[in-house]
Amino acid sequence: MSGSPHDFAADAFHAGQLYRSCFRELTENCGFTPNEMFVLLFLYRNAPEQDTAPAIAQAWNVSKPLVTRSVDGLQKRGLLYCVRDENDRRLIHLHLSDEGHAAAKALHHRCETFALTLQQGISEQEMQTLCSVMQKMQRNLNDLLERT
C-alpha cells in the first residue's frame, strides 16, 4: 500500500472481501445465518446486562425487525427463549437455552480462533495502533452517514 487514498480504498475493499469470505465460511459451517450468529454471540457475551432485541439492534446499529427475525429463528430451534420483564411488561429479555449456550460457546471459540489467526505476526503495539485507527475511521464513517 503506497498510502494514496485510492490505494487505501482498494486495499480496504479487498481486505473486506477476504474477511467476509472467511466469515461466510465460518457461519455456513455452523448452520447459522450471520445475524443469528451475532445474536447468539451478543447474548453470550453481554447477558444479562444487555439481553433485549433493542439493545442488540442499538449495539449493531441495525433495525429491530432484523434482530427480531433472527431471534424468531433461534427461538423456533430451541436455542433461546423470551421472558417478559416483571417491572416493564413492554420489555422482553432474551435468554439462551442450554443448547443455545453450548452453541454460542462453540461459536465464541471459533471466532476467537479466527481472530487469533488474523492477528498472527502482528505485535501488540501494532494491534493497538490498528484498533485506534479503526475506531477513528468508524467515527468518520458515522459522521459521513449522519450528514447524508
Question: Residue spans of the language-model regions?
Answer:
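Charged, amphipathic alpha-helical coiled-coil/dimerization segments
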Residues: 72-132
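C-terminal regulatory/oligomerization modules of transcriptional regulators
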Residues: 1-4, 124-148
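N-terminal leader segment of winged-helix/HTH proteins
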Residues: 1-30, 77
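Short, hydrophobic-biased segments on the C-terminal half of alpha helices
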Residues: 53, 71-72
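N-terminal helix-turn-helix DNA-binding core of bacterial DNA-binding proteins
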Residues: 21-63
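Alpha-helical linker/hinge and terminal dimerization helices associated
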Residues: 12-15, 19-22, 60, 103-119, ...
